[in-house]
A protein has these predicted regions:
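Conserved acetyl-CoA-binding loop of GNAT-fold acetyltransferases
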Residues: 131-135, 154-164
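Conserved acetyl-CoA-binding loop-helix of GNAT-fold acetyltransferases
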Residues: 84, 90-103, 114
């Protein structure tokens, strides 16, 4: 399938379509309780602010997904969000967006990207037991994916789990934090 990248702020229609994709991705799964189309539009407007990096991917001139990167630290930025229409899941478009974002970030001399990935649907083994200071690292090391949780997508793209925030979204609903060093490797 032929695709092209676009700016989310190229038109009002593109911004509305981005909000719709965001809403449809997160509606009903509990990670964003105040989500409605208006809050999704507000999120899109935040993501297209000057200091952010934000773009989408189109097929046949229709937006099928988009990605944003926002400052977190001077040289490490946060991926927020990455969303793909459900009918295009598993077809490589998320990786295409992520690869392009990493290239743009490298050009801006960003050296690391972090991503938070909530487990509010009991999608991983981290939601099976109470996480404590004693078991946190063993649970992260032995994480299992039960419901196609996105952490596995990130790992396939070179991201490593660097920690979790236990109970971030309620009891046994952690936020999984991942990170990738995107510096270009110099030949040895």
């Amino acid at each position: 399938m032929e695709y092209k990248f676009c700016k989310i702020n190229e038109s009002e229609d593109t911004k509305k379509e981005a909000a719709k994709i965001l809403y449809e991705t997160f509606a009903g799964i509990g990670s964003w309780p105040e989500l409605n189309i208006e809050s999704a539009i507000n999120e899109v407007n935040e993501c297209i602010a000057d200091e952010f990096i934000c773009f989408g991917i189109k097929i046949e001139n229709k937006l099928i997904g988009w990605i944003g990167l926002r400052p977190m630290y001077e040289k490490t930025w946060e991926l927020h969000p990455i969303v793909i229409k459900k009918e295009f899941h598993g077809k490589g478009f998320g990786k295409i967006l992520l690869d392009e974002m990493e290239k743009i970030a490298q050009e801006k001399e960003i050296i690391g990207i972090v991503a938070g990935s909530d487990d509010h649907i009991n999608g991983t083994s981290l939601s099976e037991k109470d996480i404590t200071g004693e078991n946190i690292f063993d649970e992260i090391r032995n994480i299992k994916n039960y419901k196609n949780h996105p952490f596995e997508f990130y790992k396939k793209c070179g991201y490593a789990i660097i920690g979790i925030i236990p109970n971030a979204n309620g009891h046994r609903k952690p936020d999984i934090w991942l990170w990738k060093d995107i510096r270009k490797k110099k030949p040895e």
